[in-house]
Amino acid sequence: KRLSRAIITILVTSLLLASTVFTPQTHAASSPRTGGAFYNYGEAMQKALLFYKANRLGDLPDDYILPYRTDAAMTDGQDVGLDLTGGWADAGDGIKFTHTISYAAGQLGWNVYEYREAFEKAGQLDVILDEIKWGTDFLLKAHPEPDVLYYMCGYNDSDHGYWIPHELLDVITDRKSFVLNPSTPGSDIAGITAGALAIASIIFEPTDPEYAEKCLKHAKEIFAFGDKYRGKNPLDVLYPSGSYLDDLAWGAIWLHIKTGDSTYLEKAKECLPTTSLGGGHTHCWDDVSYGAALKIAQVTHDEGYVAMVEKNLDWWMPNGGLTYSPGGLAWLSPWGSLRYAAVVA
C-alpha cells in the first residue's frame, strides 16, 4: 500500500539522519557507487512527510501547504452521531482505516522516539509531530467509550466504484462508519492503536504533556478492551488480519516503555513468546511481531528475544534464504517490495 511505503521511507531516512549533517542547499542525488554529491536525506524526509499531507482528510486550513487540497470527508461519523473526521485516506482510495492510520502514526512516532535530535537538525521535528498528531487526533475520536473503537469510514463496494478527489468523497460515496465492541472484537486493531497512542504519549511529553496524558489514557483503555475481548477484526478483503497477538504485544511493550508497569511487559512476552517468531518476514502493517521483539529485547536484554531478532536479520542477509535482485535488492514480495527491504535496512 502506498501509505505503508511512505511510512518505511520515513523509517529509513531517519536511520540515516543520525549521522548526517544537513545544510539548507539541495544537493544532486548521484549514485553512491560512482561517487559525487551526497543524497540530501533531510529533503527526502521532507518530501515523504508531504505525502501524508496530500492524504489528509478532514478540516484543512485555508492556507494549506498544498493549495489543490481542501476539506474532505467532513461527514465521517455523522451516521453514528460522532465526529470521525480527520486522519489519512488509504492507498489512493478514500477509505479510512484505523488499523493503517495507527500503523502509520506509530511508525512515525517510533522514528521520533529513536531519532528526535536528527529531526531537530533537519528542521522537521515540528512537521513530523504535527503530522503524527493529525493521525492520533483521529484515533482519539475513534475511541468514544472504553470498549468502543471505530475501525473504518467508507467501504470498498462504494469507494472503489469511483476515481474522484478526496473532496468529493462524502458527496459521491457512502461514508458508513464501522465499529468494534465486545460483540465485534478486533484485538489486532486495538493493540496497534494502543501502541500508536502509547508512543504518542512518550514523544509529546516534552512539548504537550496534557496531550500526552490524554493519549496514554486512551491507550490503556483501548489495550484493555482488545485484551479482554479477543478476536481478529471483521475485515476479510481489505487489510484482513493474520493474527492479533503481535498487535497486543506491540501495544503492551510500548505501554511498558511509557509507564514502567511490568504487567505490560509480561503481557507482551505472553503474546509473543520467544518460540513464536521465525525468520521469514519483517515488520509491516499486518505483522508487528518483529518490531515488538526488538523492543522487548532492548528493554529486557533477554537472549531469547535477541536471538529472534538476529535470526530474522540473518535471513535477510545475502545467502540467508531470501531472493536478491540482480541489482542487490532483497526481494520478499511483488506487492510493495521496497517497503519490506527498507524497514529491514
Question: Model-found features: residue ranges?
Answer:
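Bacterial N-terminal signal peptides
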Residues: 9-19
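Long, well-ordered core segments of solenoidal/helical folds
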Residues: 48-60, 77-79, 131-147, 216-233, ...
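Sec-dependent signal peptide cleavage junction
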Residues: 17-33
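Aromatic-lined, polymer-binding surfaces characteristic
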Residues: 186, 190, 194-204, 212-257, ...
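Well-ordered alpha-helical scaffold segments within catalytic/enzyme domains
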Residues: 37, 50-58, 105-122, 137-145, ...
